[in-house]
Amino acid sequence: MKSHIYILFCLFCSLNTFPQSAQDSVLVLTLEKTIDVARKHSPDALVARHSFRSQYWNYCYFKANYLPSLTFTSTPNFNHSINPVTLPDGTSQYVQQNQLMTDANLSLSQNVTFTGGALFLQSGIQRLDMLDDKSYSYKTNAVLIGYQQSLLGYNGLKWSRKIEPVRFEEAKKSYVETMELVSANATLKFFNLAKAQTNLDIAKFNYAQADTLYTFAQGRYNIGTITENEMLQLEINRLTEESNMMNAQIDVDDCMQDFRAYLGINQAVNISVDVEDAVPQFLVNIDQALELAFVNSPEISGMKRRKLESESAVAQAKASAGLKADIYAQFGLTQTGNELNSAYKNPLNQQYVEIGIRFPILDWGRGKGQVRVAQSQRDMVFTQEAQNRSNFEQNVLKVAKQFNLQPGKVLIAAKTDRTAEHRNEVARKLYILGKSTILDLNASISDKDAAKRNYISALYNYWALYFTLRSLTLYDFRKGIALTEDYNSLIK
């Protein structure tokens, strides 16, 4: 609903700049406005927000593992059945039981990162009701302290504390990067429509010129100043431009539909893009760009995370292959009684210790093989990440160098466009005066059209490189500030 209101507001503001006869359902968008809409309403932007929220709550879950947790449990049960009961003399006898067991337990637990174990504190009460004779009794655990620990095992808490902060930092950087890529994609859609509309304008202009020249040539042919072949060539030019105009209209419709879909515009609104001729004139310090990319890019954080994950896998494989030992110990105070008060009087000591050991004697090299596989995977990851880092560095350098050249290319393309238009006008006048051939005229038309298209492409290349460089470095070189987002607003 908000996206529709925003688009209709833009539509209202844009349409007020046109006469009523020409403004029906026409939305004029600049590149800046296009990017603003795309960052709010495009499918890529919405997916990025949901992805970040998922990573955020995953990080919250990770942090909660290192905080105390308080849990209440109760498992009341009713039993009316015949069960074997051991008598004082050691014999067993089937006895009908009709009883109700109710309990309540409160447990406070805390994971210990350094050891990977867990410390817990419990307090609970049980009540047993014998329904046949209407008697009851209580059992209490006033306080119970316990600890469980896997000795020589894999410490997942320690490795998670190394990996998860890096993963969340990567998620934050990835969101900023994705929004810059959304800007780059919006720029692509914008200039695709700009190119299509430029081609349509070219086709309309060329058709009008071809129609005028063909009409003029008919008169010259009637008085014998041009050959039939030349007049037929002009007729072919006219028909070709008419066909080009129809094809260009189809391209405009297709690009406009794609453009609307990406911006989240569901209404059948005609859009006209307003391409600004000027581009910001500034150069990027290549060394600074490379340094910022290594600090800010999520690619670098991802490399670090994957290395840590591979080392964690090796540690887990080693722990699984060797000696395993688990210890469980609890100490507390307990008592029973026929009344609740008596169940808390003179509590008795309660101790319980359990140690479990597992050592593989014969596994046919399975444990060793798991370790070797994990080590090979780790070495492969380290090799791949070293290559990825080198490729990333080369990509940053290439994009920065290309961007620094692009403002000059835009100026050259603009000058070429103006010169080609002037040359076409001169060639047309010379042809009308009979001082030029149809071949020269056609060549000037082709050069004019190519120059206009090259100019639009040069503008697109500038902005594509601009947003690509921002996505690689997460830095705005125009304003000299780091790119960031209001992450708190994303999780609301």
Give the role of each language-model region.
Residues 18-24, 71, 80, 279, ...:
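Acidic, low-complexity, intrinsically disordered peripheral segments
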Residues 1-27:
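Bacterial Sec-dependent N-terminal signal peptides
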Residues 96-100, 137-139, 347-349, 450:
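Short sequence motifs at beta-strands and strand-loop junctions characteristic
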Residues 72-78, 121-127, 327-333:
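Transmembrane beta-barrel strands of outer-membrane/channel proteins
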Residues 36-46, 53-69, 105-137, 145-162, ...:
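A glycine-/polar-enriched beta->alpha junction
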Residues 47-62, 178, 182-204, 214, ...:
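Amphipathic alpha-helical coiled-coil segments
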Residues 35-39, 91-93, 226, 230-231, ...:
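Amphipathic alpha-helical coiled-coil scaffold segments and their short linker/junction regions
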